[in-house]
């Protein structure tokens, strides 16, 4: 039976997943001193980044421009601030499930500044993930918010676009920001169906940006 054709059941399932995500996310204090992803931490030098455990290095601006490793970060084009964006994934030989963040297939981008230090990290749920996994993608944002402390977030809700419809009775366009321990965080969550999408197609995503906070 296709759940997407049963809005009530689908909505109940989404709410249940959301409750589980919140319940299983550990509480955090309003200071954060851990790594931001695995062994990656904002501010660390690029030459300190571990090569083992990571694969598929490429320039985010042109993913056909492959890199041998972190050490080749200067081969990618810099933006106006001198920051270079490196796409990467997890080595399947050490990460059996592939590039996953908190159980969600993810697209990862590391930002390195012109001094050779990690300036930021971007995490996006993978839109090519299988449907049964992808329809939980909006929950990753809840897990990210809990990781950095549930308090102190400033959130806003976007207005529906022309013809946009809820999915399973839920419409979500949320953007939340927070600054903590020298990190500027942005968590965006979307769940809706555009007018050009059929019953099995919809927007369901989380985008997370972790940058060094400006003084």
Model-derived features with residue positions:
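C-terminal segment of classical bacterial N-terminal signal peptides
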Residues: 15-23
């Amino acid at each position: 039976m296709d759940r997407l054709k049963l809005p009530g059941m689908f909505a109940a399932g989404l709410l249940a997943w959301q409750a589980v995500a919140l319940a299983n996310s550990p509480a955090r204090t309003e200071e954060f001193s851990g790594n931001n992803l695995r062994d990656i931490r904002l501010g660390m030098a690029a030459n300190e980044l571990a090569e083992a455990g990571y694969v598929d290095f490429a320039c985010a601006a042109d993913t056909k421009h492959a890199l041998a490793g972190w050490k080749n970060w200067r081969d990618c084009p810099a933006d106006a601030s001198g920051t270079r964006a490196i796409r990467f994934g997890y080595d399947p030989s050490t990460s059996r499930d592939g590039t996953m963040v908190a159980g969600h297939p993810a697209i990862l981008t590391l930002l390195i500044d012109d001094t050779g230090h990690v300036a930021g990290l971007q995490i996006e749920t993978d839109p090519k993930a299988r449907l049964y996994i992808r329809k939980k993608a909006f929950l990753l944002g809840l897990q990210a918010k809990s990781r950095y402390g549930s308090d102190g977030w400033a959130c806003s809700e976007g207005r529906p676009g022309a013809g946009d419809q809820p999915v399973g009775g839920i419409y979500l366009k949320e953007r939340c920001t927070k600054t903590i321990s020298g990190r500027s965080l942005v968590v965006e969550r979307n769940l809706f169906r555009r007018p050009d999408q059929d019953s099995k197609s919809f927007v369901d995503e989380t985008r997370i940006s972790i940058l060094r906070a400006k003084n």
